[in-house]
């Protein structure tokens, strides 16, 4: 593949691992949302990066042999962290940290409901909440996934495909509701989740469907704060904030303050097997494609 020269403040990274293979309805980007590799070239305005450096990167559409992106949006991988492990961290941890810590300001003792908690963002969110000392309520779609999140320290584990979680949350909080809901459900289950947020609490919307216009929420939801999260928008509007979060979570994962995410690697030539594995929806690992060399 032909690789162009980097712009003034850009870096070109030769991919070693690519993660984030899911395609969402309405998505306009190509496949691949994060990964890791080595620098092959940097622009004349870039300092602190050199050819050969190992980098992790959140870059939508990065399922390609080389990725060109702004230098501030990459993060050097510490020596203690494997490149395969690093590839699965960027989007999951940036999303979870931004929602929980920058928007919701999760604190010790607060109750956080995490939907679909066995996925990458969910597992990252659980690790962040454990570190913060929050109570974790979590949902997942089958028994195996629920067993996993129970092992990860969830106090209350429920079925993400059944409306019964709403009653369980209200019972466990004596009718008060959760301080924070990290949502990825849709339809009726999304509506139920909106009504589980206590007055003054925070609803973080990760889904791409059913997102409500800010300032247009039903008055019945009281004083709840509502934030949709979109990393493409965050990278465009607040690149320094996103880069700061990225650097912090990579460092914390390398130093053991946050948990690494489980990964399963496939050779790039075996991409069909990787996609079939992903579409089976039974996995609880981050799927990574491994490039040659």
Give, region by region, the residue ranges found by the protein language model:
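N-terminal glycine-rich beta->alpha transition that marks the start or flank
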Residues: 1-35, 62
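A glycine-/small-residue-rich N-terminal strand-loop-strand element
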Residues: 24, 31-60, 78-80, 133
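Short helix-loop-beta connector
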Residues: 50, 79-83, 105-111, 175-176
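Mid-domain Rossmann-like dinucleotide-binding core that forms the NAD(H)/NADP(H) cofactor-binding site
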Residues: 90-163
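Glycine-rich cofactor phosphate-binding loops and adjacent beta1-alpha1 units
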Residues: 104-106, 120, 128, 155-223
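C-terminal capping/lid region of NAD(P)-dependent oxidoreductase domains
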Residues: 112, 175-180, 191, 250-264, ...
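Glycine-rich phosphate-binding loop and adjacent beta-alpha segment
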Residues: 132-150, 188-252, 291-292
